[in-house]
Design a protein with these regions (language model features):
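C-terminal and inter-domain tail/linker signature
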Residues: 1-230
Length: 230
């Protein structure tokens, strides 16, 4: 790949390897060259700007969950060497809560949840990111209820951090709109129909033995769970 370290064979290989290098191999300093200095990272909890903010957040998470593992389930991508790439990395993350931190005093409990990181990359550098993690699933597996945890967190921090909203977004450099891949278009159509409450699409498009995972660590089998969770 033009502009990328030759040890990476393709974009999924790049995404998976640097994720492990940063998190599991403790290569936090590599964020200075893998992440752009002014990268915006958009999360439900707000907007973070700059690789230093990402380094600080990573340090805090590792202090709270030192045995955290990030297991790559899949990486899908679009783009090319000249225009740059967009990746979507679906992750299973496991950890044990052995340190004090954002999730309160150490509980000694473990969790397994999913996360998805969408990253725009060019020339060996990630310059724009969107990240969502199942925080509700973490909270529940640590023995708390999400609403109670959120209220306690607001009280501890002296007020709520404003959640991410397009009104306070900033330009990160990625201006494309994906592509016209037939499978992406099909998924977009399924999700649009579900969000429009056309749940007939689930039985029409999902296998009867489908396994679905939803926010809050709620996983289940077949059409009934998929319909109920939505």
């Amino acid at each position: 790949m033009k502009g990328f370290d030759p040890r990476f064979t393709d974009l999924p290989d790049y995404i998976i390897k640097i994720t492990r290098e940063i998190w599991e191999d403790r290569g936090l300093a590599t964020l200075h060259h893998y992440y752009a200095p002014d990268i915006p990272v958009r999360m439900p909890s707000g907007l973070s700007v700059g690789n230093r903010a990402t380094i600080d957040g990573t340090l805090a998470t590792l202090a709270e969950f030192p045995d955290r593992e990030i297991l790559a389930e899949d990486v899908i991508w679009s783009g090319d060497e000249d225009a740059g790439f967009l990746s979507s990395h679906r992750i299973v993350t496991t950890a044990t809560h052995t340190g004090n931190g954002v999730f309160g005093p150490a509980t000694g409990r473990s969790f397994t949840v999913r996360a998805i990181a969408d990253c725009a990359a060019k020339g060996n550098v990630i310059y724009d990111e969107w990240l969502i993690r199942d925080a509700g699933g973490i909270v529940r597996q640590l023995g708390m209820e999400p609403e109670t945890f959120a209220r306690d967190q607001i009280a501890r921090e002296g007020g709520a951090v404003r959640p991410f909203h397009p009104d306070h977004d900033i330009a990160g450099g990625y201006l494309s709109r994906g592509n016209d891949n037939e499978w992406g278009a099909r998924l977009a159509d399924i999700l649009t129909r579900i969000m429009d409450k056309d749940f007939t699409v689930i039985r029409a498009e999902y296998d009867r033995a489908v396994r679905t995972e939803h926010a809050g660590g709620q996983g289940g089998w077949s059409w009934g769970h998929a319909e109920t969770a939505w």
